[in-house]
């Protein structure tokens, strides 16, 4: 199974670029930008990557993001991920970025998006990896902040494929951002949203009915609502599931408890992704291998989820066929 996972071409649809910041690069960028870290070494940073829930992870995640300042930093961050993606036979990726994490520290929006998109262009030219960029609003910030960020995004509309929603779900339902998403769709952006990770299955309904999303990021709480499971299967609304993340953040106690196989067997369009791989102990192939071993998935299951990742992507039909043939 390991060899098959490594050999098959794959698409990744749920990867936060800030979450691919490995400790080694964190220290390099901290030195470049004269930033003091609370960790004295790379090893100490790695040991600190222990979380009890989403919020405790976010506290460390944002500390790491503080080393990102200039265009070069965002280029290096993105390029590092793309090099790993190439080694894992990822031929298409749709990357999240969180501009508010940086603009709130005084980092220019232009530096963020230019650094990332220049790396993505180089990834296409030098590595053969196609990509789209998804801007995520931080749901624990205000709607006004999201609107301000959207105005910045509109200026770079040709570089941003979709608008998303992430960060702490608790007390931050999708409905809070309905008007912002209405505006985003009117401007031509596609929409996705994190829902049903820590939040209830109702958050998934809200993302579908109010935010009009093309796919649900995480979505594993759908299992609590049989009608929702039936609807997701009927409409083939994709779920971008992140197994190692779910265990690391205590959504499930262990991979053996994960409901991915149940959802897959009920006909849902399930995909596997790495989420924040630097923090959760594995990139895409490691997620595939770990969940395959834990749930005793078959090669047919594996093939189905890889097919789903291309089907669920924002590529057009001919692009999907071309990449998968390769």
UniProtKB/Swiss-Prot annotation:
One of its GO terms (molecular function) is adenine deaminase activity. Belongs to the metallo-dependent hydrolases superfamily. Adenosine and AMP deaminases family. Adenine deaminase type 2 subfamily. Keywords: Hydrolase, Metal-binding, Nucleotide metabolism, Zinc. It comes from the Bacteria. One of its GO terms (cellular component) is cytosol. Catalyzes the hydrolytic deamination of adenine to hypoxanthine. Plays an important role in the purine salvage pathway and in nitrogen catabolism. The active site is at 197 (proton donor). It catalyses: adenine + H2O + H(+) = hypoxanthine + NH4(+). Binds 1 zinc ion per subunit. This is Adenine deaminase. The keyword Metal-binding applies. Zn(2+) binds at residues 14, 16, 194, 275. The record marks 218 as: Important for catalytic activity. It is an enzyme of class 3 (hydrolase). Pfam families: A_deaminase. Substrate binds at residue 276. Its EC number is 3.5.4.2. GO terms for biological process: adenine catabolic process; hypoxanthine salvage; nucleotide metabolic process. NCBIfam families: aden_deam (TIGR01430), PRK09358.1-6 (NF006850). Its cofactor is Zn(2+).
């Amino acid at each position: 199974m390991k060899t098959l996972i490594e050999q098959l071409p794959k698409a990744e649809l749920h990867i936060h670029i800030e979450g691919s910041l490995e400790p080694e690069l964190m220290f390099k960028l901290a030195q470049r930008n004269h930033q003091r870290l609370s960790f004295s070494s790379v090893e100490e940073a790695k040991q600190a990557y222990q979380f009890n829930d989403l919020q405790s992870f976010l506290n460390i995640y944002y500390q790491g993001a503080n080393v990102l300042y200039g265009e070069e930093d965002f280029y290096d961050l993105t390029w590092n991920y793309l090099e790993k993606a190439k080694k894992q036979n990822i031929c298409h990726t749709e990357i999240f970025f969180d501009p508010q994490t940086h603009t709130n520290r005084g980092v220019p929006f232009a530096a963020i998006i230019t650094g990332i998109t220049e790396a993505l262009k180089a990834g296409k030219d030098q590595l053969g990896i196609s990509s789209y960029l998804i801007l995520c609003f931080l749901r624990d910030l205000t709607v006004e902040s999201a609107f301000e960020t959207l105005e910045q995004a509109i200026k770079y509309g040709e570089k941003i494929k979709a608008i998303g929603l992430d960060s702490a779900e608790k007390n931050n339902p999708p409905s809070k951002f309905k008007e912002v998403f209405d505006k985003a769709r009117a401007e031509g952006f596609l929409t996705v949203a994190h829902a049903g990770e820590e939040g209830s299955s109702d958050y998934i309904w809200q993302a579908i009915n109010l935010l009009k999303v093309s796919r649900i990021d995480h979505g594993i709480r759908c299992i609590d609502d049989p009608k929702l499971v039936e609807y997701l299967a009927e409409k083939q609304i994709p779920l971008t599931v992140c197994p190692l993340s779910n265990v690391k953040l205590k959504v499930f106690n262990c991979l053996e408890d994960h409901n991915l196989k149940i959802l897959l067997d009920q006909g849902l369009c399930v995909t596997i992704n790495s989420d924040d791989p630097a923090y959760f102990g594995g990139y895409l192939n490691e997620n595939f291998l770990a969940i395959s071993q834990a749930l005793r998935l078959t090669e047919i299951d594996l093939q189905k989820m890889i097919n789903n990742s291309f089907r669920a992507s924002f590529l057009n039909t001919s692009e999907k066929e071309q990449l998968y043939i390769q």
